[in-house]
Amino acid sequence: MKKTLSIIMALCMVLSVCFFSVSAAEAKVGAVAADYKPEGTAITDAAGFAAMAADGIYYLANDITLDATWNAGVAVSSTYKENNAFTGTLDGNGKTITTSAPLFANLQGTVKNLTIAGAIDGGGLNCGVVTMWTKGTLTVENVLNKATIVNGNTTGGILGYGATGTVATFKNCQNDADLIAASQIGGIAGYIQDDVVVIENCVNNGNLRTDNYGAGIIGRFGRDAGALPDSVATITGCVNNGTVSSAKGQSAGIIAYLVGGAQIIDCVNNGTIVNDTATSAGILGSTRDPDKKKISGVLIKDCFNYAPVNGVTYVGGICGYLGRDANSHDGWNFRMENCGNFGDVTATGSGTMYVGGVSAYGWGGNVGSNGLANGLLNCFNAGNIKVDNSGDDSVKAYVSGVIGYFNTTVYTLENCFNAGTITTNKTTYATLIGWNNRGEGAEGVTADYCKNNYSVASGDIPVFYNGPVSESVGCTVATADQFASGEVAYLINEAAGATIYYQAIGTDKAPTLIAAEDGSNVVEKKADGSFANPAKEVPEDTKPADPVPTGDSALIFAIVAIISVLGIATVAKRKEN
C-alpha cells in the first residue's frame, strides 16, 4: 500500500507541475501563443536584421545574436540622434535576441513580443536596450529585457532618451536586468522630455544605480526649461521590485522627477529606495513647474509602497515633493487618493528636512484645472518613521505620520491615518498627522478641510499644526489596541458614510484599503460595543448526500477527482485553441 501511495502522490505532483508550468508559460512577458502567426518578412540572422528597411515590417523566425546596432548604415556615435530612424515594426514572435549593443539608435516605430538578453556597455551615451533615443511615435509591447547596461548616460531597460515631441507607449514590458548610469535611469525609460507617455502594466525587477534621477519605471518626465503645458504622463498598473539608489537628485519606485501633468494609478513599489543626498519616495520622487505653465496637476491613486525608503531632504512613503516651485501656485493641484505606505521611512542628514509617512511636502494652489482640490483623501501610513538630523538648533525637520509639510489655501486632508511610530531627535516641527504652514486664518482656509483623521501617539508629538497654532481639529489620537481591534476602521467608515477601510480582526494590526473578495474583512460593530468581521454563513443543510469516503478510499477518491479536473481542463484548452 505504501508503494502504491507513493506512486499515486508522485503522479499527482507531476501532473500539478505540468499544469501550472503551462499556465506560467502562457503568461510570460515576451512570449506569444502557440498558434500566433506574425506578419512581414522573416529575419533569421544578424545580417538580416542589419538589412531591414527603415519602414518595413519584420519578424524573427528564430533566436539571433547581434553585436551592432541597426542604424541604416550610419555609425553610432555622439551624433546618433540624427541617424535614420527605424519607423517600421519588429515582431519578436516570442524569440530572443542576445546582444552587446542597443537594438536601435533611433526608434520611431513598434517593437513587440520579444525577449532581449546580453550585456551592453553604454560608452557614456544615452542607452536603452531597445533604443537609445527617440523623437516621434514609439510603441513597445510585450517585451522582456534581460540585458544589463553599464556606463550609460541617460539609461533605460527599454528606452534611453525621448526628445521633445515624443509620444511613447509601453505596455506589458518587463526589465529583469541590473542597470548602471551616470544620469537619469529607469527600468523602462530613462528620460522623456515631453509630449505624452503612456506606461501600462510594466514591471522592473532589476537593481538600478545612478548619480542622478532614478526610478523603477521612468527616471524623469518633462524638462525644466520650456516645458509644454499639455505634457502628460499616464502610468497605470506598474510595479517596481528592484532596489533603486541615487547619489543625488531624486529616487523613487515608479517615477523620480516630473515636470508636467500626471496620473499614476494602481502602482506598487516593493524595492528599497535610497538617495544619498536628496529626495526619496516609494512612488513619486518630486514634481516641479519652473516655468509656471499651470500644468493640470498630479493625481496619485490606488498606489502602495511596501519597502523601506531612505533619503535626506524630502522623504516620503508615497511621494517626496508634490507641488510647484515657489509662488504662483493657483490653478495647479496635487492630489492623492486611496494610497498606503507600509515601508519604514528614514531621513538622515544635517539640513532642513521634510518627512512624511505618505507625503513629505505638498505645495499647490486652489483648485486645479481638473476641478479637484489639493489634498490627501483616504490615505494611510503603517510604516515607522525615523529622523536623525545632526544640524544645529536652527535647522528645521518637519516630520509627520501622514504629510510632513504643506502650504496651500484650499486643502483636503480627510479619512487618513497614521499607525506607525515616529522617532526624531528634532521635535519642534513634528506632528502626528501634518503641518499646514498656511493654516486657519489665511484667506479661504477653515478647519473644515481637515477631518476624520487618526493617529497612534508618539511621545509628546502634537497631532496637527494648523497655521499659527497647534491644534487637533479633525484629528484624533487612538491607541494601538484601537487600531488592532478594528475600532479605528469602523469609526472612519462611519463618519465618512462609506466603507473605505477593511481589516481582518486578529490578523491586521491596522486597517487596509484592500477588500477581501469574499467580504470577510469588513469591520462591523457588535451589540456589546466590540468590533468583528462578519460571521461566516453556514448552509442550513450541511449533511452530505452520500457517505464521506475514509481511509484509502478517501485518498483514491481525491486522486481521481484531481486527475479528472486536469483532464477536463486540458480538453477545454484544446477546444479553445
Label the predicted regions.
Residues 533-552:
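Short, aromatic-rich amphipathic segments at membrane interfaces
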